[in-house]
């Protein structure tokens, strides 16, 4: 019995040993399969360039941290389309892997050859963009990197011209350093960004798209564009992007004397003498308008019927007016206007442009009636039947002198630009008013046709009532009497309000646009001159 039990114990122990050996073999097999799977996965990651930072130093057991190094935090490297930077874990030895640079775009990284220390390479920049030379730009401590071919898109700029940017090269750090304004912003991710230079660099990357960040003032952005010598075309693109057109280049006379006279008469802000002349011109215009209005105040003048005898008496009174103070005031004003117009015409750089200018035509029309009235008075006496109407028209033309103030008033010039840009809206308003005028005048005539005391005797006679009602003036000289006439009048008033309200916001928007543009032009001109002085 003892031997039998001992035999069974030995057999059971042998079975346990065989089971343990089988489990060990199975575990070893699983480990080998797992190692094979891991090696295959690592091989696939290397081929597919997934997490390349794990294989920089030939070690796959440790995965580098995603947190940037203190150097990266102090000097972040920025670019608009891709973020270039050196990895914190990149080896500093002589191995081939340690000599590379990482091109970071999101979470994927691609190893590129790092630029050599010392003088930058001046070899050709043609070829694939990922094999192009990388240029490092340091703007007040913030580093940017881009390809040299990107900067060469604008070869005349400061960054695009190698000779120009060579003056800012620092050989110790192998970068171009610019001590410029640094408009930065830190978001909730504690990411510091230089929006000002990013927008400058974006001009190179986008091929000429100028976009000013909202946090960057206009004068600072313009100063930076002038510093980096972006060119007139990009400056014009910037002006258009800001909502206004670049002012046209002013033609100036080549002759020195003509240039001085032209500046005195045409540009009041050019000198103190020009301001004095402009002030005298405004005073003479005001005096002429006051004299023109005060001359019509009745004193001992009696209304006379318009006939040949009245015309003859009017012509005789012209001789008596030579002794009137209004005549001498008019003569003095006309002499000033004439001298001013002649000096402008003599010194202008282009005679054709001067003759076709609206303001110059107004100046000529303002002085022409006086000379026609003065030199042809004797001739008018022989043909008195037509001279009376001509003289009245010439007197009426004198009122156009008020438009001479537009030469010295920016507000009147803005109003004129608004009217010119709103011609389509005015035509649309007149078209709607004409349709409503015919419809409601016809309705009012037929609605009031049965009333005995109605003043709406015809459709043209109803035009006045419809026009006054649609413009919400309502003189009250014409009033509908029938109930249907009152209904038509009420509908006419409501339609008139809607018709007038539709184009008015567009006209107001045009006025605001030109007003804001004029203010910006003045601000940009002053700040641009300051920027030129700073750059010089």
Swiss-Prot record:
Keywords (A to Z) from UniProt: Ion channel, Ion transport, Membrane, Potassium, Potassium channel, Potassium transport, Transmembrane, Transmembrane helix, Transport, Voltage-gated channel
Region (Disordered): 1-31, 87-131
Recorded coiled-coil stretches: none
Location of the protein in the cell: Membrane
GO biological process per UniProt: action potential; potassium ion transmembrane transport; protein homooligomerization
Superkingdom assignment: Eukaryota
SUPFAM superfamilies: POZ domain, Voltage-gated potassium channels
UniProt xrefs under Pfam families: BTB_2, Ion_trans
Reported tissue expression: Expressed in a variety of interneurons and sensory neurons, as well as body wall muscle.
Protein name: Potassium voltage-gated channel protein shk-1
Organism the protein comes from: Caenorhabditis elegans
Lineage: Eukaryota, Metazoa, Ecdysozoa, Nematoda, Chromadorea
